[in-house]
């Protein structure tokens, strides 16, 4: 069993973009930024326990950090992990109303 403290460290924030809003409407899929060292099972249990919804599947993607230029220096943004969480039909993940 994963501790409550670990659940809160797994999920970092929702990823808001045009693609994520389309996937939410069409496929009932939520996109979240998660910690880089988490597994799919940890993500699934964290979402189910924190938001009280049933998760159908979890898919993860590593996003490579971009190379940015700042005056005459090159700066690299850090890599991060994104999780596509498919919620079962009839359930919805609303971030503002489910937080206790």
From Swiss-Prot:
Is-annotated flag, keyword Ribosomal protein? yes
The UniProt entry, under Pfam families, shows: Ribosomal_L23
Whether Transcription counts among this entry's keywords is no
Q: Which gene encodes it?
A: rplW
Source taxon at top rank: Bacteria
Which HAMAP family does the record associate with it? Ribosomal_uL23_B
This chain belongs to the protein called Large ribosomal subunit protein uL23
Assembly description: Part of the 50S ribosomal subunit. Contacts protein L29, and trigger factor when it is bound to the ribosome.
SUPFAM superfamilies (alphabetical)? Ribosomal proteins S24e, L23 and L15e
**GO terms for MF:** rRNA binding; structural constituent of ribosome
Q: What does this protein do?
A: One of the early assembly proteins it binds 23S rRNA. One of the proteins that surrounds the polypeptide exit tunnel on the outside of the ribosome. Forms the main docking site for trigger factor binding to the ribosome.
């Amino acid at each position: 069993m994963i501790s409550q403290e670990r659940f809160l460290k797994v999920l970092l924030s929702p990823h808001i973009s045009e693609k994520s809003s389309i996937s939410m409407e069409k496929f009932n899929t939520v996109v979240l930024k998660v910690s880089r060292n988490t597994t799919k099972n940890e993500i699934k249990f964290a979402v189910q326990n924190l938001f009280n919804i049933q998760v159908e599947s979890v898919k993860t993607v590593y996003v490579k950090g971009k190379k940015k230029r700042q005056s005459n220096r090159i700066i690299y943004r850090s890599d991060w992990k994104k999780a596509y969480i498919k919620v079962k039909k009839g359930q919805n993940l609303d971030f503002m109303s489910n937080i206790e």
